[in-house]
Amino acid sequence: MSKPSRRANRQSILALRKQKKKAEKKLRQAKHGVKITPGAAMSNGKSRLKDVAQESQARQQAVSEQVRIFRNQLPILLKRLSRIEDPRNAKKTKYQLTLLMIYGILSFVFQMSSRREANREMSLPMFKQNLKLLFPELEDLPHSDTLMRLLERIDVVQIEKVQLDLVESLIRKKKFNRYLIDGRYPIAVDGTQKFSRDYLWSEECLQRTVGKADGDQMQYYVYVLEASLAFSNGMTIPLISEFLSYSEGDTDTDKQDCELKAFKRLAARLKSEFKRLPILLLLDGLYPNGPVLEICRNNHWDFMIVLQDGNLSSVWEEYEGLKKLLPENRYQQKWANRRQRFRWVNDIEYYYDRFKKQIVHVVVCEESWKEVDPDTGEVVTKTSRHAWISGQALQPNNIHQRCNLAARHRWNIESEILVVKRHGYQYEHCFSYNWNAMKGYHYLMRLGLTLNVLAQYSECLIQIVREKGVRGFIKFVRNTISGPWLDAAWIKQRLAATYQLRLI
């Protein structure tokens, strides 16, 4: 006799689905009158365009606005790119260095997945004709290998200087002022693996032993520490990339370069590039330690650092003991659909390296919310707990801003890493097995990402981005440039008009 199946039948599945819909409706009714942050999900509706004429107008509008944003930043890009020393023989050079760099940036703006795809797609006659209409500076498009050979020979760090100049220009123009936290620029830092191989293709690669079916095997990988501006509206602007390198470690003791060592180098570069910029660092649970706090204080940086349960036991002991004596250090609020309860203790002394001391402030947020259980269809209460070390004393009037609008948006950089890995920027693709060229492509990718982010959060394009999603918008623009949609006279008139970037 066979055992009865535990698998749900069709009737049970339909009943569960009906139960979930009822529970979700109940939650929506309970949230009535509460302002909910809009989600990132794109529209599920049919196209609002009624005929070919409307589609043509929409396509030209999207392309022209995207290109106007790019061309608005073009003088800064060209000025800095022109400073890069070109090692090639001028008499034998067909393409200027600036043209090759712009070509590389555009290949990432349009999300070309490889050098081969860039060759195949961007050299099509219609694409070239439209690209020349949009960018008259591009008299002809090079072969991708020409760009690769150039990146092998130049100082590619200068490409990242272009990125920093672009961001510095936006800061000077006060484009980010509405997103600042107590007058400071929130910068999130996080490390991630770029890609790995089973063979040593460059001496700079880090190495590790991984288990295989036939025994242990050496693996060689590239790891990068990224720093980006992380604003509370979700906008994340790339800043600096610090590559970990085998040569930066201690080769005599087989101690490799690590994220904390890379952070010291990144912090020095960040201070060098933005000497007077008021900064609020957002760091994860790897960073709450004396040397990192010392770097922040010496550079006059504020910080919000994730404090995990196992970190800084002496600080946790002080917090648990003092919070009972400070019942006034508490704050409750309803934020979106969550009930939040904050407790904090200021001026905790943290000792490290024998005689060194830092004063830190600890805050713990416990929150609860209701959601539909996907297994039962019932409304259940969920809870979570977050703790941070703060560089400034905590008070009821700054707790929401520092925790919800700053510290929690450290996750922006994790979302950014997910985007560049999975949403078309080919972060994990090795565009060249030359270390210098590989880094050069990485910096070009970050520039392309920045331009797309500015378009995504611009007032003139926000409606179509919300309709199609970010990837859908980029595909929409790329397909338009690939086809016979553009009216040359209208495009030239549109691009000739004055333009000012306005962010939402």
Regions of interest found by a model, annotated:
Residues 148-233:
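Active-site-proximal, Lys/Arg-enriched surface segment
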Residues 103, 118-119, 143, 147, ...:
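Short, conserved catalytic/metal-binding motifs centered on acidic residues
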